[in-house]
Amino acid sequence: MDKKMRILCEVCLGDKNIDKLINEIRSNIRLKEASVPKCRSMITNIMEKNLEKLSRPPRSREEIEKLYFYLNTQCVNNIIEIIAKKYPNLHVNKKKNACKEQMKRDLDTWGNRRNHVLDRPFIKPRRENSDDEDEQQDGPKNSDFGFMGHTSDSQYASPFENHSITNLPIGQKQPFNNPHQSNRNTSDFESRLQQYMNERDYDLPRNQPPPEIDFTLDHSGEKVMKEKLMRKMGAQSGMNGMDDMGGVCGFNGMSGMNGVGGMDDFYASILGQGSPMAQEGSLGSLNPMNLMTPINRNNQMNPMNQMNPMNQMNPMNQMNPMNQMNPMNQMNPMNQMNPMNPMNMGNQNNQNGIPFMGMGNPLMSVSSTNLMNDQMGYGGFGQSEKNIQFQNDLEKKLAERKIMDLETGQRPEQSAYNDMQSHQMMGSLGSMMNPMGQMNQMGQMNQMGQMGQMNQMDPMNIMNPMNLMNQMNQINSMNQMPMNQMYCNMPNTINC
């Protein structure tokens, strides 16, 4: 007998191995102590028969180990089958929750084989990597079920975990809804390469273009690039109107598109007041497309212009006959159409996009006191969008009432509030009805751009002795006439 064959026989027929097989049989069969010697003899006989069936001796140590485990398994299964057929009541049923009727039904249905359970279908998720750096997504990818891949060992079906199947051994990963572990083998070079790239490229900065070289002699190229960058950022965020604070493009009347981009609500500007951003000094109110000029907006929204009795009741602002009847203010064609007239600078700004925008001194684009009012909060900074919309509707109704009264020849009822609202509305009504921005008879003196706007907030006009001491015109019958409360009179213009 070969040496390796002799070693295999000694190991399989040894007392230690036989005792091990008896303990394994007793775990499946209720075996009494008196039946142990008979079981030992059965194990020896079956093992000898199986050894004789071998066609050749083992050739290596690995084959000896494989034959050892195989012969032990065959011996135990044969003895359990013999005893279970002869003594069925001695067989230990390890199916805890299965009754005899269920066992018989499975036997009649499927026969002597494992229960056939259909696996849930699995679709391999498509690759979601892209060559585009902007659209590349690192980390776990979505599966075809619409959820992220998970790796937990849950034994129940859950949309946020792995799906469970019934015929999978306990401890093995479930393949469903887990694209990271499903359909993967050691030879899948492409998937391992993609995983490696995701791990290495995670949270790494992208390649940035090199900075542009400043070739200008006065080193002004850096400033120009900063201005372009700020305009680009403003266009992307829709907040071009905030550039007013920096003076980059807020008061640059030559860039026509900036004014359009500053309006976040175009329909609100059509109603007359402009966008809500326009009340914060943005470009919405300065846009030539806007029906409300910044001067009229200050007339309506500025509380110092609405409630200040110096502006409402001052005879120099309201009741001065020079503002009412002077042909230079109402009918002078040089004030209406002449673009070179410095008194009509604000009106021409709305037509030609001149950088001064009618905000004060034409030599300094941001020298107007009104700009400070808008930025510091006096130009309607605290107005809410609902209040602005309500005031727009009210002004439209008052304008319609005023037009109806003028057409029918009736005298409207006068009151302090009606006078104030009608005074505010006449300037905006004139700008809406006159598409060319010409001066009309009711309120377009607000368009005069050089020094007339200083009547709004200029302390020289508020504290002017001519405005404070002139009490004779307060009791004048002209006090009841609906005039624009922000008229720019000639004495104030001269004083400025």
UniProtKB/Swiss-Prot annotation:
Residues 118-187 are annotated as: Disordered. The lineage of its organism: Viruses, Varidnaviria, Bamfordvirae, Nucleocytoviricota, Megaviricetes. This is Uncharacterized protein L357. Residues 151-187 have a biased composition (Polar residues). Residues 118-129 have a biased composition (Basic and acidic residues). It comes from Acanthamoeba polyphaga mimivirus (APMV). It comes from the Viruses.
